[in-house]
């Protein structure tokens, strides 16, 4: 909105000074106008500067022109466009000399990185400055911000990718990790070899036991266990020797010699020493004549077949139990055969 030069302030002050216009406001002129005792001109509501009116009915002098009040013309734009009156003034572009802060403010050496959303918001604000920041302080989308001006509470070191000067920086953490693994192997290896005394001072990583040493320890532990097994077998054969015949002892010796081969290895518990065919035939023949033997007859049979009295007694007991079981099964089979389950 533009105003001509020859307009007098009377045209603006007339509605306020008129009797009809004054009725819309309070009788006192101070509600919309300052007193002109201190200043030559007063501030009118929404109209910038205007000559002060001491009384309500008194108007401005027609001889005065707007040229006498240059500040009044500067406020016409804001009076014409009310929205522009509340617009904030943007800062004028000015160069930044350096990134340093006054000594009273704490400064961090770490540069924090803004996220993608914050970079998009801070983009138009950065365009206000005519000169860019120096490269020493501004990296790739990085702005040095002190701790209390930090954009987010999270640590910036986690978001920032590490900039390593050379290959040595990468090798350092891997060497530390590698130093832990040989230590774990060193702790596990003595368990394979049996009881080994640990030294007071830990061994270095270069002194870890080689696989050949572990094999020798296992081979030493093997012969130690084998004599104990052979002694147990000999003790068992010694217990059975008075009750078994010479043929059975020979068969047991042959079995002991063949236990080393994995093809003939026996699984489960050790079976009893079986009777020979000749012994079983004589016992079966005697069982057919009489299932129960007297003491005298049992001693005679034991001498003839080279068995002890106790062995013959146990064989007859087992044979009777077997016969009883067979008779029970045959009886059940006969009973079930009479019924037709259809």
From Swiss-Prot:
SMART domains in the record: HOX (SM00389)
Ubl conjugation found in the keyword field: yes
| Positions bearing Phosphoserine | 189
Cross-link (Glycyl lysine isopeptide (Lys-Gly) (interchain with G-Cter in SUMO2)), chain numbering: 106, 195, 254
Residues modified to Phosphothreonine: 8
- Point to the regions of Polar residues compositional bias: 1-11, 204-219
Q: Which GO terms describe its cellular component?
A: nuclear body; nucleus
Residues in the DNA-binding region annotation: 268-327
GO molecular function list = DNA-binding transcription activator activity, RNA polymerase II-specific; DNA-binding transcription factor activity, RNA polymerase II-specific; RNA polymerase II cis-regulatory region sequence-specific DNA binding
The annotated region (Disordered) lies at 1-29, 187-271
Q: Which PROSITE patterns match?
A: HOMEOBOX_1 (PS00027), HOMEOBOX_2 (PS50071)
At the top level, the lineage of the source is Eukaryota
Which UniProt keywords are given for this protein, alphabetically ordered? Developmental protein, DNA-binding, Homeobox, Isopeptide bond, Nucleus, Phosphoprotein, Transcription, Transcription regulation, Ubl conjugation
What are the boundaries of the signal sequence?
none
A biological-process GO annotation: skeletal system development
Report the subcellular localization: Nucleus
Q: What does this protein do?
A: Sequence-specific transcription factor which is part of a developmental regulatory system that provides cells with specific positional identities on the anterior-posterior axis.
Family designation = Belongs to the Abd-B homeobox family.
Q: What is this protein called?
A: Homeobox protein Hox-C10
Source species, please?
A: Macaca mulatta
Quick one: which gene encodes this?
Answer: HOXC10
């Amino acid at each position: 909105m533009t105003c001509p030069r020859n307009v007098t302030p009377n045209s603006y002050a007339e509605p306020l000074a008129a009797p009809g216009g004054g009725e819309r406001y309070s009788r006192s002129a101070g509600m919309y106008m300052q007193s002109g005792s201190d200043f030559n001109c007063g501030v009118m509501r929404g109209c910038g500067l205007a000559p002060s009116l001491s009384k309500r009915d008194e108007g401005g002098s027609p001889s005065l022109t707007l040229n006498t009040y240059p500040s009044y013309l500067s406020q016409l734009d804001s009076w014409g466009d009310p929205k522009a009156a509340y617009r904030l003034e943007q800062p004028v572009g000015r160069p930044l000399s350096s990134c340093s802060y006054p000594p009273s403010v704490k400064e961090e050496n770490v540069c924090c990185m803004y996220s993608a959303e914050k970079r998009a918001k801070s983009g138009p604000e950065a365009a206000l400055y005519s000169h860019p920041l120096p490269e020493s302080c501004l990296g790739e989308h990085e702005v040095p911000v002190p701790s209390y001006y930090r954009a987010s509470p999270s640590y910036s070191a986690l978001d920032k990718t590490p900039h390593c000067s050379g290959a040595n920086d990468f090798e350092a953490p891997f060497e530390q990790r590698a130093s832990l693994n040989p230590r774990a192997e060193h702790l596990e290896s003595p368990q394979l070899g049996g009881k080994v005394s640990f030294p007071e001072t830990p061994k270095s990583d270069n002194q870890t036991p080689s696989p050949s040493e572990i094999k020798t320890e296992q081979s030493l532990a093997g012969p130690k266990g084998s004599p104990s097994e052979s002694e147990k077998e000999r003790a068992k054969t010694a217990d059975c020797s008075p009750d078994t015949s010479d043929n059975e002892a020979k068969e047991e010796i042959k079995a002991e010699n063949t236990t080393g081969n994995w093809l003939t290895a026996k699984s489960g518990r050790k079976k009893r020493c079986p009777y020979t065919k000749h012994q079983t035939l004589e016992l079966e023949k005697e069982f057919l004549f009489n299932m129960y033997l007297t003491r005298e007859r049992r001693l005679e049979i034991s001498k003839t077949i080279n068995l002890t009295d106790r062995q013959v007694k146990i064989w007859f007991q087992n044979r009777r139990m077997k016969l009883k079981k067979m008779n029970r099964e045959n009886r059940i089979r006969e009973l079930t055969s009479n019924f037709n389950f259809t």
